[in-house]
Regions:
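Amphipathic alpha-helical interface segments used for oligomerization, scaffolding
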Residues: 1-178
Length: 178
């Protein structure tokens, strides 16, 4: 199991010299996250690779996943099955792992299953980033920037959503109309 995990980590781009540290962290994540080594390794490598992180960040990523599990109504096993579908989109728009974790905590805590949360968050990010969408038009009108440009310039996802909420409030619409 350990040797397979090391092989999987190295195959996914982790440095051979750091494989022992990586596998040790994956083992800890598997135990604390109610999952198996394969899922832990896959989730960690997917996250590190998508965000361009080095192996020295594996502990930070693992801690963030455990925190998401502890604060939300999800498990690392459920996150592991879903994150791979969302992280590429989030990374493309410069939405941080911290912001993704907060979104998962909020949605799962409110009774939305992890897989469904993934679909909702992914759709939201794509809608915000899609040229010509109502949300994109509002962001451009209010800031002169696209969603990607706002995220690249240091805005947080919460700040971007607040711009839309403010517009909804001032126009008497709901966020769903944005």
């Amino acid at each position: 199991d350990i040797s397979e995990a090391a092989y999987s980590a190295i195959s996914a781009g982790q440095d051979t010299a750091d494989a022992v540290t990586f596998v040790s962290e994956a083992n800890t994540l598997a135990k604390a996250g109610f999952t198996d080594m394969d899922t832990a390794v896959d989730t960690l490598t997917t996250t590190l690779n998508a965000y361009g992180m080095e192996t020295d960040q594996v502990s930070r990523v693992s801690d963030k996943l455990i925190t998401t599990q502890n604060l939300g109504k999800t498990t690392v096993n459920e996150l592991g099955s879903s994150l791979g579908k969302l992280i590429p989109t989030a990374a493309m728009y410069n939405v941080s792992l911290d912001e993704l974790s907060a979104a998962y905590v909020t949605t799962t805590k409110n009774g939305i299953a992890t897989a469904e949360s993934t679909t909702y968050i992914n759709s939201m990010l794509n809608e915000l980033g899609k040229s010509g969408s109502k949300s994109a038009d509002i962001l451009s009108e209010k800031t002169g920037k696209t969603f990607s440009e706002l995220m690249d310039s240091g805005y947080t996802l919460s700040e971007v959503l607040q711009i839309l909420q403010d517009e909804a409030d001032s126009s008497g619409k709901s966020m769903a109309d944005m």
